Amino acid sequence: MSPKGSLWYKNAIFYEVYVRAFYDSNGDGHGDLAGLIQKLDYLQNLGVDCIWLLPIYPSPLRDDGYDIADYYNVLPTYGDINDFKELVRQAHARGMRVITDLVMNHTSDQHPWFQAARSSRTSPYRDYYVWSDTDQKYKEARIIFLDTEKSNWAWDEIAGQYYWHRFYASQPDLNYDNPAVQEEMKKIIRFWMDMGIDGFRADAVPYLFEREGTDCENLPETHAYLKEVRAFLDQHYPDAILLGEANQWPEDVLPYFGNGDELHMNFHFPLMPRLYMALKKEEKTPLEWVFERTPAIPENCQWCTFLRNHDELTLEMVTPEEREFMWREYAPDPKMRLNLGIRRRLAPLVDNDQRRIRLLYSMLFSFPGTPIIYYGDEIGMGDNIELFDRNGVRTPMQWDASPSAGFSAAPPSRWYAPVISTPPFDPQRVNVADQIRRSDSLYHFLKHLIALRKAHPELASGETRWIDTGSPSVVAVWRAESDRWLFAIHNLADKVQEINLTLPVVTGELTDVIEGRLTFNSKDSRLKVQPYQTVWFSNNVK
């Protein structure tokens, strides 16, 4: 691992793991921490630097663990605290870090705090949540899950009051106006940091506080508390990071970086749909537009970028017309849609076209930001739109070609979810073992791309310039730091593009560092780019 005090997260490769889906070590049909430990060598060989764990806490699993019933323990089907400590130890021994989800905004309604709170108005936990005698407060706050929730308030018969929830009614919001809640969250942070983890992905951070007359998002009180948490981390765990989930426009996310004293990293949500939009339209305008709206951030901060994750491909930050376009092109079946988004994985979104998958990865790795890979997307796994809600993109990892995909020795009736069984995404066609054997596989392409990114630190923190190509279908980016530079070209079209380039420097003949075939003489501005081709030229070739 990089040394303490370094900005390690700026040049890291993050890998998102849903423990339940990864590998079942004890034959109960559920992935577990011991199973993940057995697969750490696989992640190390791929080139992963940091593992992000979805929630591992005890939970009724109405929202796949984001409804926490105990912040100080591990879901029994995943293992126990000792298993978690061993995971962290083994990951660190392989040079990989571990961060876990910190669900700050809400708990499960099964949490003992909420059960005590609803039982009596004099309970010390009553003020851990937001209660009201009316459901008319905070009317300007939007409803996030419009598919299932009609209000942000839910009536509790036992409490005799309404409680506030920004997500599902089974997830009551914590009351951060209560100093005891603020201190409790710091205790939780200390508990897990003392086990050696390297930070947290802070879930749903814009919604911590409520104020009448506002939309109850991005409030000054929220930023003040997050800065307090950051100062606490910096004092006690200076190498740890906070990665924020703020599904907002880049200019609204900017304050979450503070002056480099709030969150270390934030997801860049609006980029994800525009990568797919640009690809389908075969034009770079959506990408140019979103990067023009992306402000500069403090030097010690970083954006996190991604092609897909465990949720739907969110279309909250597109116009209604763009949303209809995305649904029409990428989710023609209503089962593929969820809330304001698309519940599909990377490979099915692009019809399993390996050229387009590789192009998307190349853009992700050459554009500004730290990339995150969602488990299974490194081999092009499929989805199951027949499963409920977001479960369709959370199916078992496919390790081999067996009917169980090598995920579990349990009978299929005990699996937490079925393995993808229909071509072209069934285990016989998509699995880790096969792709490791084949040098031309998506796995090996991505492994090569990861190695290239690490060999080119200018991609992590260097200057970014967008180069005119003379073609609306070809996006080109120049990344430079000190005397090192890398120039990446991406053809979004399904036809050959002849482009004209004027580079910031003239160096003579260059060779593509991805495949080593295409050459370009920078003294000659003309270049022919094949359909969906991606090329990287660099003066830093090892």
Q: Model regions: which residues?
A:
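Active-site and adjacent substrate-binding regions of carbohydrate-active enzymes
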Residues: 1-542
